[in-house]
């Protein structure tokens, strides 16, 4: 186990035999790069905040029928992925704390298996996040460029099948990760998926925003509801751009860590970067905290439902808000 309260995502055979999962290359560079120790309370606080926020998001989607649309179903899938990464990091933090302070005793083999479970949960979470973001992007694309056929294309049953397929694929990825945890190819595949997702999203967004203005002018003569749907689609695309930007900023250091761990594990500069792994985990958890804030900032309907849920739970009575909400 890592003495600074967190496991490395995959030690790839670099861990010591006494159960310490810190890479040898990181230890060799300790004189040059000091590992940034982060208090266990920070991980637990972020995990709790993220968990409560994302439960609120899912509750809002379930409660408000106006949010029963494909886009918000995909947002709900993204919220579940954020919850999963928060739960895994919090659970891992508690386990390491108990082991470090001798409140919990486990055999080395059990520690290794538990480490694989934590890593698998992170793997499932990142794959689910990428797939959910991609699904939202496709939904926004259809909303903007196929506005008149949107209801026929993106039905509730079809969006449910997409979400089911996403999580079945994620579960398969998590299973493969546990079975082949010693193989570097698993990490390479995860990195390739991340880069492929970025390429697909960049291509989709470039095409979407280049044509959006022209397409909006072209349908200006159509009935007002089509124009409203189109403007809503553009607003949703901007929201997705914000979600994607935060995702990249928060997850990129983690994936760079994986790339360096494979390509130059014994290089001192690479080891220096990898020695701050705990900070990259903090960034991942910050992503789970920021996403619900973006939903609330960008969606009046979501914001209104958040207030209703919080007020009802606090006072056990429905709240009434001004019509501007």
UniProtKB/Swiss-Prot annotation:
For the Extracellular compartment, the record's topological domain ranges are 1-37, 98-114, 180-186, 266-273
Pfam families associated with the record = 7tm_1
* Primary localisation category: membrane
Write out the S-palmitoyl cysteine lipidation residues. 311
* Residues of this chain annotated as glycosylated in UniProt: 2, 15, 20, 28
Q: Which GO BP terms sit in this record? A: adenylate cyclase-activating G protein-coupled receptor signaling pathway; regulation of metabolic process
- Localization annotation: Cell membrane
- Locate the coiled-coil region(s) and give their ranges: none
Give membrane topology per the record: Multi-pass membrane protein
Q: Name one GO molecular function term.
A: melanocortin receptor activity
Residues annotated as transmembrane: 38-61, 74-97, 115-138, 156-179, 187-211, 240-265, 274-297
User: Which cellular component terms (GO) are annotated to the entry?
Assistant: cytoplasm; plasma membrane
Q: Which UniProt keywords apply?
A: Cell membrane, G-protein coupled receptor, Glycoprotein, Lipoprotein, Membrane, Palmitate, Receptor, Transducer, Transmembrane, Transmembrane helix
Q: Does the record's keyword annotation contain Lipoprotein?
A: yes
> What residue ranges lie in the Cytoplasmic compartment?
62-73, 139-155, 212-239, 298-325
InterPro entries attached here?
A: GPCR_Rhodpsn, GPCR_Rhodpsn_7TM, MC3-5R, Melancort_rcpt_5, Melcrt_ACTH_rcpt
By sequence similarity, the record places it as follows: Belongs to the G-protein coupled receptor 1 family.
Q: What does this protein do?
A: Receptor for MSH (alpha, beta and gamma) and ACTH. The activity of this receptor is mediated by G proteins which activate adenylate cyclase. This receptor is a possible mediator of the immunomodulation properties of melanocortins.
Q: What is this protein called?
A: Melanocortin receptor 5
Organism of this sequence: Bos taurus (Bovine)
Highest lineage ranks of the organism? Eukaryota, Metazoa, Chordata, Craniata, Vertebrata
């Amino acid at each position: 186990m890592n003495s600074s309260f967190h496991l490395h995502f995959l030690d790839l055979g670099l861990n010591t035999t006494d159960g310490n999962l810190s890479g040898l290359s990181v230890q060799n560079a300790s004189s040059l790069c000091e590992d940034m120790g982060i208090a266990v309370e920070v991980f637990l606080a972020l995990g709790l905040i993220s968990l409560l926020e994302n439960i609120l998001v899912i509750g809002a989607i379930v409660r408000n029928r106006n949010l029963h649309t494909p886009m918000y179903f995909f947002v709900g899938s993204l919220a579940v992925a954020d919850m999963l990464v928060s739960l895994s990091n919090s659970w891992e933090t508690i386990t390491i704390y108990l082991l470090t302070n001798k409140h919990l005793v486990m055999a080395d083999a059990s520690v290794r298996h538990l480490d694989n479970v934590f890593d698998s949960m992170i793997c499932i979470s990142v794959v689910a996040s990428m797939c959910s973001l991609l699904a939202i992007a496709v939904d926004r694309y259809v909303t903007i460029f196929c506005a008149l056929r949107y209801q026929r294309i993106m039905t509730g049953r079809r969006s449910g099948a997409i979400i089911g397929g996403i999580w079945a694929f994620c579960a398969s990825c998590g299973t493969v990760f546990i079975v082949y945890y010693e193989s570097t190819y698993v990490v390479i595949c995860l990195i390739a998926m991340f880069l492929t997702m970025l390429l697909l999203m960049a291509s989709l967004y470039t095409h979407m925003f280049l044509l959006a203005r022209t397409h909006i002018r072209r349908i200006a003569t159509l009935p007002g509801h089509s124009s409203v749907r189109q403007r809503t689609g553009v607003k949703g695309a901007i929201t997705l751009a914000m979600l994607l930007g935060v995702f990249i900023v928060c997850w990129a250091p983690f994936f760079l860590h994986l790339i360096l761990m494979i390509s130059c594990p014994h290089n001192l500069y690479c080891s220096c970067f990898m020695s701050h792994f705990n900070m990259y985990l903090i960034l991942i958890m910050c992503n789970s905290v920021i996403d619900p804030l973006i939903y609330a900032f960008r969606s009046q309907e979501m914001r209104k439902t958040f207030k209703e849920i919080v007020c009802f739970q606090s006072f056990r009575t429905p709240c009434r808000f001004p019509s501007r909400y």
